[in-house]
Amino acid sequence: MSSASYQDFGWTSEGAANGESGVGLAQTLIKRVTRLENVTRICDLGCGNGYITGRLAALGFDIIGIDASESGLQIARQQYPQAGFIKSFIEQTIELPEAGTFDLVISSDVIEHLYKPAQLLEAARFLLRPNGQLLLGAPYHGYLKNLALALTGKLDSHFTVLHDGGHIKFFSVKILSELITAHGFSDLQFSYYGRAPWLWKNMICHGRKND
C-alpha cells in the first residue's frame, strides 16, 4: 500500500492481531522460522505492533520490523526494545540501507490488506540476500471453503464489506503461488493453520529467492 492510499486505523494493544487465533498463527510462524537453516538476520515486513518481531528477537535472531503504522511501532518499540523497528511504506523499502542483507523475510497477514500486493513481493526480494528465504502468511481461500461459506450464509460477514479497513484481496494457493513465482521466488511449499483440511483459516508459504 502506498503512502498516498494508506490509512492508519490504529493499534491499541500489544497482543497478537485477531486475538487467540492470531496467537496460534504467530506461534506456528515462529516455529517455522526456528526450523529453517542458515537464518540469522530477519526482516518482519508489515510487523504491526511487533508481536512476532519481539518474540523472534527474544530467541536470539537479529531482526528488524518494518511497518507504516505509527501507533503499531510505538507499541513495538516500548514492548520489544531488543528488536529494531523502522517506519516505512512498502514501496520505500528499496531506499533502506539494509536491503540485500537479510537471510529471511517474514510477512504475516499483511498482503491481503494491500491494493498492490505485488509491491510486497518486490520489497521482500529487494531486502533478501541471494538465495534468501521468504515466509508469507495469508488467509486461506479455496473452492470448498468458499462453497461452505456460501451454503451456510456466511459470505457477507466473512468478507466484511461494511468494515472500515480490513481485507482487500482474497488468495487461493494457486493465485498466491502465481504472484510469488512471478516476482522471483521458487521452491514454494505451503502449510496450513486452523480448522479442518480444505477449510483452513490461514496458509503459510515458504519460498526461496532466485539468484
Annotate each predicted stretch with a short phrase.
Residues 1-100, 104, 120-121, 136-141, ...:
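Conserved N-terminal segment of class I S-adenosyl-L-methionine
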Residues 10-12, 151-162:
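Short glycine/proline- and charge-enriched loop/turn segments
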Residues 71, 115-119, 146:
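Short N-terminal helix/helix-N-cap motif within the alpha/beta-hydrolase-1
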Residues 104-110:
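A short beta-strand submotif of the Rossmann-like class I SAM-dependent methyltransferase core
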Residues 112-115, 171:
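Residue-level signal for the nucleotide or nucleotide-sugar donor/cofactor binding architecture
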Residues 121-130:
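A short glycine-rich, Lys/Arg-flanked "PGG" loop and its adjoining helix->strand segment in the class I
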Residues 135-157:
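Conserved class I S-adenosyl-L-methionine
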